[in-house]
């Protein structure tokens, strides 16, 4: 279907460029939500602005729905982007330049391009005069690259309270490592951050009996935590990973025993564990070696996996029909807002190729953007045609 269209004539490319031109570096919106709202209302969507947060600078979010019957398919994404960095861009990061068959700009693949492709798919179906059996919605946040406190989590709570929970959700994150059609994400590992502070008694290194060295106790804790693998992985998940990220004593003197020692670590864990179970384990190990240790744990998300569904099969079939690739079902990589959505409905993630995301000269081939539009349109037609 893309062969009959010039890139300049496609709603997906036009919207992608408009979104990139909105400098929505988290936590600033830069007008991106407004750009998307106008596009959706132009297609007949009912759009609800959902700002959440404290004070005047609240996080912009939106929920938009077209139709009221079932099945209800939701597309989820984010308009905020990471900072472009200090320089090195061939063209401006918010210029949305077209060059050598690619669209350049911060957010091109992560994930303004994915949002534009889905909206473009809906626009194509509506412009053809076809009707969709059911309803289509979008959950869009301006708070995914940041703390994610007042974004998707809050919108989902609002959706549940207003009878808007979908039957299935697609998140448009750039899931493909190399080629469009490589991977559908059907789950994610959980993530836990921990801070361990071991108190001691400061003193001169020549008189250790008058001091209590917290570094030795901290090393014993870290040695115990890393002594053996957490697990061997499962059918769908790679082995859980514990990585020590910082060790700090705040002491550059060579003749002083420090008064305290601090370490931070991260665990990416599979569905053999829960965040609370790992937190209890860390605290238990710490208190064996240092009864006075202070352990602070933040659980960013639990591991989850979407079981096979007809919608997942339809998405995979649509991808293969357009790209010729049978997508691999995968759970690797970092966390995403799918971890929140999985509490409400089955969710899968599929978007553009992510090789350049968060990098200087982030870009997406225009051919990939148009092909993703084809995939989303084919999926909508299979599910709701």
Curated annotation (Swiss-Prot):
Residue positions binding Zn(2+) 2: 110, 145, 358
HAMAP family: DapE
Binding of Zn(2+) 1, residues: 78, 110, 173
Transmembrane segments: none
A Pfam family assignment: Peptidase_M20
GO biological process: diaminopimelate biosynthetic process; L-arginine biosynthetic process; lysine biosynthetic process via diaminopimelate
Native source species: Gluconacetobacter diazotrophicus (strain ATCC 49037 / DSM 5601 / CCUG 37298 / CIP 103539 / LMG 7603 / PAl5)
Subunit structure: Homodimer.
Keyword Iron-sulfur: no
Molecular function GO labels: acetylornithine deacetylase activity; cobalt ion binding; succinyl-diaminopimelate desuccinylase activity; zinc ion binding
Top-level taxon: Bacteria
Name of this protein: Succinyl-diaminopimelate desuccinylase
Pathway info: Amino-acid biosynthesis; L-lysine biosynthesis via DAP pathway; LL-2,6-diaminopimelate from (S)-tetrahydrodipicolinate (succinylase route): step 3/3
Active site: 80, 144
Family matches, as PANTHER family: ACETYLORNITHINE DEACETYLASE, N-ACETYL-L-CITRULLINE DEACETYLASE
Cofactor: binding details: Binds 2 Zn(2+) or Co(2+) ions per subunit.
Catalytic function, reaction form: N-succinyl-(2S,6S)-2,6-diaminopimelate + H2O = (2S,6S)-2,6-diaminopimelate + succinate
Originating gene: dapE
EC number(s) recorded for this UniProt protein: 3.5.1.18
Family to which the UniProt record says this protein belongs: Belongs to the peptidase M20A family. DapE subfamily.
Zinc found in the keyword field: yes
Key words of the record: Amino-acid biosynthesis, Cobalt, Diaminopimelate biosynthesis, Hydrolase, Lysine biosynthesis, Metal-binding, Zinc
């Amino acid at each position: 279907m893309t062969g009959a269209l010039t890139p300049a004539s496609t709603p997906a490319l036009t919207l992608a460029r408009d979104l990139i031109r909105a400098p929505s570096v988290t936590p600033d919106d830069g007008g991106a939500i407004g750009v998307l709202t106008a596009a959706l209302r132009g297609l007949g969507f009912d759009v609800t602005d959902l700002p959440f947060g404290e004070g005047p600078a609240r996080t912009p979010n939106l929920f938009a729905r077209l139709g009221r019957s079932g099945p209800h398919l939701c597309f989820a994404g984010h308009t905020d982007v990471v900072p472009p960095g200090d320089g090195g861009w061939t063209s401006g990061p918010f210029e949305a330049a077209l060059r050598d068959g690619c669209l350049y700009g911060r957010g091109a693949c992560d994930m303004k391009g994915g949002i534009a492709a889905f909206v473009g798919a809906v626009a194509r179906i509506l412009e053809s005069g076809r009707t969709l059996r059911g309803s289509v919605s979008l959950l869009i946040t301006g708070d995914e690259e940041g703390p994610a406190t007042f974004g998707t989590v809050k919108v989902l709570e609002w959706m549940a309270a207003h009878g808007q929970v979908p039957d299935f959700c697609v998140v448009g994150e750039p899931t493909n490592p190399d080629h469009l059609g490589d991977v559908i994400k059907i789950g994610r590992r959980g993530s836990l951050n921990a801070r361990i502070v071991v108190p001691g008694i400061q003193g001169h290194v020549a008189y250790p009996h008058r001091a209590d060295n917290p570094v030795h106790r901290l090393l014993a804790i870290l040695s115990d935590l890393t002594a053996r693998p957490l697990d061997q992985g499962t059918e769908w998940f790679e082995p859980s990973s514990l990585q020590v990220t910082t060790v700090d004593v705040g002491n550059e003197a060579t003749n002083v025993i420090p008064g305290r020692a601090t370490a931070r670590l991260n665990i990416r864990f599979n569905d053999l564990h829960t965040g609370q179970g790992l937190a209890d384990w860390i605290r238990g190990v710490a208190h064996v070696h240092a009864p006075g240790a202070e352990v602070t744990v933040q659980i960013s998300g639990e591991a989850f996996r979407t079981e096979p569904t007809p919608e997942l099969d339809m998405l995979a079939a649509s991808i293969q029909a357009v790209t010729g690739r049978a997508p691999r079902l995968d759970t690797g990589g970092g966390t995403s807002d799918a971890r929140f959505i999985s509490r409400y409905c089955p969710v899968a993630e599929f978007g553009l190729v992510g090789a350049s995301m968060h990098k200087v000269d982030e870009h997406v081939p225009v051919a990939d953007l148009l092909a993703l539009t084809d995939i989303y349109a084919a999926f909508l037609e299979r599910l709701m045609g």
